[in-house]
Amino acid sequence: MNRTEKEQVISELHEKMAKAKAAIVAEPKGLNVAVVTDLRKKLRDAKIDYRIVKNTLAARAAKGTPVEPVADRFVGPTALVMSYDDVVTPAKLLADFMKDRENFVIRTAIIEGKVIDAKGVQALAKMPGLKELRGQIAAMIAQPATKLARLVGTPGQQLARVVGARREQLEKQA
């Protein structure tokens, strides 16, 4: 890789690191091409970047970005997973991926400016994602309106039942 290519990689990585809400630094040892391709596809479908990075270039790119505090963890084989919207989804996908693989290890992460360790990433993976939270909030907002509609409708239903029962009673007498 010549100097121009390196500068281009640094510039591209710097731009992505600056926009990332979540960046997870992992160690991908002993993974075959099919497994990595499958992981990349799952992450890409969730709009998450996965890159095997050259440590020196990644460390230079991290300067002046939210990822800078974890730049010292760019040692050995390094994969960088970056998300620009949801901070929980990458943790969930990586935790799911790691269930069957001991070789893939999360070193550290930076989530919205806060450095967390591998255990913190595992804990984050157990939290509901952005879409799930939105669904829960929508359900909580809709619930009082549903209850109110039921309460408003109940007296009318009861009155209709009483009138119907009285009508049947009068019909039987006639």
From Swiss-Prot:
Source domain of life: Bacteria
Classification via Gene3D superfamilies: 3.30.70.1730
Signal peptide positions (record): none
Any one cellular-component term (Gene Ontology): ribonucleoprotein complex
Molecular function terms from GO: large ribosomal subunit rRNA binding
Disulfide topology: none
SUPFAM superfamilies attached to this UniProt entry: Ribosomal protein L10-like
GO biological process, one term: translation
CDD domains in the record: Ribosomal_L10
UniProt entry keywords in alphabetical sequence: Ribonucleoprotein, Ribosomal protein, RNA-binding, rRNA-binding
Function field: Forms part of the ribosomal stalk, playing a central role in the interaction of the ribosome with GTP-bound translation factors.
Protein family according to the UniProt entry: Belongs to the universal ribosomal protein uL10 family.
Subunit (UniProt): Part of the ribosomal stalk of the 50S ribosomal subunit. The N-terminus interacts with L11 and the large rRNA to form the base of the stalk. The C-terminus forms an elongated spine to which L12 dimers bind in a sequential fashion forming a multimeric L10(L12)X complex.
Protein name: Large ribosomal subunit protein uL10
Source organism per UniProt: Anaeromyxobacter dehalogenans (strain 2CP-1 / ATCC BAA-258)
Record gene name: rplJ
